[in-house]
């Protein structure tokens, strides 16, 4: 029996919304995947790119990667990978972070010139090739000739049929070379799989955690985790491995019923947190009439102790203005014009307007801006 764990887009070191907790989540998810590999006695792990979130990962990210990968080495499970776009330096002459792990004999970096052989299965890999170099990708793909269907190809590219936006894809499914039994794709964060007429499988493992809010819908439909591949015969048989991640939710509030909406969300989260250890992240859509941001954030304060983090994801409020016109006076300086506009039309007090003016003048100083925002909203940033 030959078992392979296919994972991708782990983005080690990513600190979503600058939250230390999210960086720890990412390491924990990677560790869980290694736990699964060891428990299932897999013969190899294949990783389809974006092992790290950036091409120059922090010391923390490197140390955690080394610690976790050492556990695989201790039980003789090889870790095969290709660099993704996040792993790849944008300047020539710089090494990918994988080289450090390779020097420590913790991973094998795949290429398309010579396969890695594991129990008779050929494993090829093509590193991420950017859109401007599509011709290089096409050439590399056309040169591949596996000996049999007991073969795997790792890629980290945008695929037109899945990402049909200008500049987001570098290849089409029809460009995949014939003859492989399993095509292990990365780059796209939502799971996807297709069994072709010849029995071969094209599979996107997806990211094992929710890296962006647009992944929430896909997570709710398909889950997050990995694919466990049984390659004992000529063609692969896939099983879906799901893992538990910190929940992220898109919620909607209306400024007309803002207190009621927020309390409803709060009550739901209190109930959720009774059975879950991980407080969720909220992506808030605001509807209704326009509301001053400082007042809006004050209304959101009841969510502070039930959510790890919340943000205004979409502001879909509208402003009703009756015959509003504003002529810039010629006898006043810019400061006075700004103060007058903020107090007369935005209904700020004069003190608040002065604070906003100071924030505008010191926009390049995060420290000053954050201090002023604290005064305006009463929220620690």
UniProtKB/Swiss-Prot annotation:
<dbReference type="InterPro" id="IPR004843">
    <property type="entry name" value="Calcineurin-like_PHP_ApaH"/>
</dbReference>
<feature type="binding site">
    <location>
        <position position="50"/>
    </location>
    <ligand>
        <name>Mn(2+) 2</name>
    </ligand>
</feature>
<dbReference type="GO" id="GO:0008408">
    <property type="term" value="F:3'-5' exonuclease activity"/>
</dbReference>
<dbReference type="GO" id="GO:0006302">
    <property type="term" value="P:double-strand break repair"/>
</dbReference>
<feature type="binding site">
    <location>
        <position position="156"/>
    </location>
    <ligand>
        <name>Mn(2+) 2</name>
    </ligand>
</feature>
<dbReference type="InterPro" id="IPR050535">
    <property type="entry name" value="DNA_Repair-Maintenance_Comp"/>
</dbReference>
<dbReference type="InterPro" id="IPR041796">
    <property type="entry name" value="Mre11_N"/>
</dbReference>
<dbReference type="GO" id="GO:0000403">
    <property type="term" value="F:Y-form DNA binding"/>
</dbReference>
<keyword id="KW-0234">DNA repair</keyword>
<dbReference type="GO" id="GO:0045027">
    <property type="term" value="F:DNA end binding"/>
</dbReference>
<feature type="binding site">
    <location>
        <position position="11"/>
    </location>
    <ligand>
        <name>Mn(2+) 1</name>
    </ligand>
</feature>
<feature type="binding site">
    <location>
        <position position="50"/>
    </location>
    <ligand>
        <name>Mn(2+) 1</name>
    </ligand>
</feature>
<keyword id="KW-0540">Nuclease</keyword>
<feature type="active site" description="Proton donor">
    <location>
        <position position="86"/>
    </location>
</feature>
<keyword id="KW-0479">Metal-binding</keyword>
<feature type="binding site">
    <location>
        <position position="9"/>
    </location>
    <ligand>
        <name>Mn(2+) 1</name>
    </ligand>
</feature>
<dbReference type="InterPro" id="IPR053459">
    <property type="entry name" value="DSB_Repair_Mre11/Rad50"/>
</dbReference>
<keyword id="KW-0255">Endonuclease</keyword>
<dbReference type="GO" id="GO:0004519">
    <property type="term" value="F:endonuclease activity"/>
</dbReference>
<comment type="similarity">
    <text>Belongs to the MRE11/RAD32 family.</text>
</comment>
<keyword id="KW-0464">Manganese</keyword>
<feature type="binding site">
    <location>
        <position position="189"/>
    </location>
    <ligand>
        <name>Mn(2+) 1</name>
    </ligand>
</feature>
<keyword id="KW-0227">DNA damage</keyword>
<keyword id="KW-0378">Hydrolase</keyword>
<dbReference type="InterPro" id="IPR032885">
    <property type="entry name" value="Mre11_archaea-type"/>
</dbReference>
<dbReference type="GO" id="GO:0004529">
    <property type="term" value="F:DNA exonuclease activity"/>
</dbReference>
<dbReference type="InterPro" id="IPR029052">
    <property type="entry name" value="Metallo-depent_PP-like"/>
</dbReference>
<dbReference type="GO" id="GO:0003677">
    <property type="term" value="F:DNA binding"/>
</dbReference>
<dbReference type="GO" id="GO:0006281">
    <property type="term" value="P:DNA repair"/>
</dbReference>
<comment type="subunit">
    <text>Homodimer. Forms a heterotetramer composed of two Mre11 subunits and two Rad50 subunits.</text>
</comment>
<dbReference type="Pfam" id="PF00149">
    <property type="entry name" value="Metallophos"/>
</dbReference>
<feature type="binding site">
    <location>
        <position position="85"/>
    </location>
    <ligand>
        <name>Mn(2+) 2</name>
    </ligand>
</feature>
<keyword id="KW-0269">Exonuclease</keyword>
<dbReference type="GO" id="GO:0030145">
    <property type="term" value="F:manganese ion binding"/>
</dbReference>
<comment type="function">
    <text>Part of the Rad50/Mre11 complex, which is involved in the early steps of DNA double-strand break (DSB) repair. The complex may facilitate opening of the processed DNA ends to aid in the recruitment of HerA and NurA. Mre11 binds to DSB ends and has both double-stranded 3'-5' exonuclease activity and single-stranded endonuclease activity.</text>
</comment>
<protein>
    <recommendedName>
        <fullName>DNA double-strand break repair protein Mre11</fullName>
        <ecNumber>3.1.-.-</ecNumber>
    </recommendedName>
</protein>
<feature type="binding site">
    <location>
        <position position="187"/>
    </location>
    <ligand>
        <name>Mn(2+) 2</name>
    </ligand>
</feature>
